[in-house]
């Protein structure tokens, strides 16, 4: 059996649980992310904070890139991670810092 190399957890989930992915695609993005009560920038910052707080580092690179695309600066993300350290713990913040550094270093090198 050949090994499939997925570039993201979402891609792997799409292959294994297509109905879950369809639900996310039909609900999360059209209904939640498009609600005008919060800007995409604010939603991205909230999402990054939630992922860090919950320890879901596997989704963090994609959402860090999305946050940058939605106008959150690297300095703002660094400040948010530092702020979170005092509320959700230093290990999670340190892991998030390392992931952010790798994510943005990779982006700058491409």
Kindly give the residue locations of the regions a language model identified:
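Short, structured motif recognition centered on aromatic/hydrophobic residues
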Residues: 43-51, 80-81
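C-terminal structural segments of small proteins and small subunits
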Residues: 78-101
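Residues at the start of alpha-helices and the adjacent loop-to-helix junctions
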Residues: 41-42, 59, 72, 88, ...
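Short alpha-helix boundary/capping elements
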Residues: 50-56, 88-89
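N-terminal alpha-helical segment
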Residues: 25, 42-45, 60, 77
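Mid-chain, well-packed structural core segment of small domains
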Residues: 58-81
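Acidic, glycine/proline-rich low-complexity segments that act as flexible tails and inter-domain linkers
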Residues: 1-41, 53-54, 65, 69, ...
């Amino acid at each position: 059996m050949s090994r499939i190399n997925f570039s993201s957890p979402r891609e792997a989930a799409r292959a294994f649980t297509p109905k879950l992915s369809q639900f996310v695609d039909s609900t999360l993005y059209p209904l939640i992310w498009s609600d005008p009560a919060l800007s995409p920038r604010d939603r991205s910052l909230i999402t990054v904070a939630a992922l860090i707080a919950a320890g879901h580092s596997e989704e963090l690179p994609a959402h860090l890139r999305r946050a940058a695309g939605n106008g959150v600066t690297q300095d703002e993300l660094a400040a948010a991670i530092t702020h979170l350290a005092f509320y959700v713990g230093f290990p999670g913040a340190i892991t998030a810092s390392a992931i952010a550094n790798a994510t943005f270093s990779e982006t700058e090198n491409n």
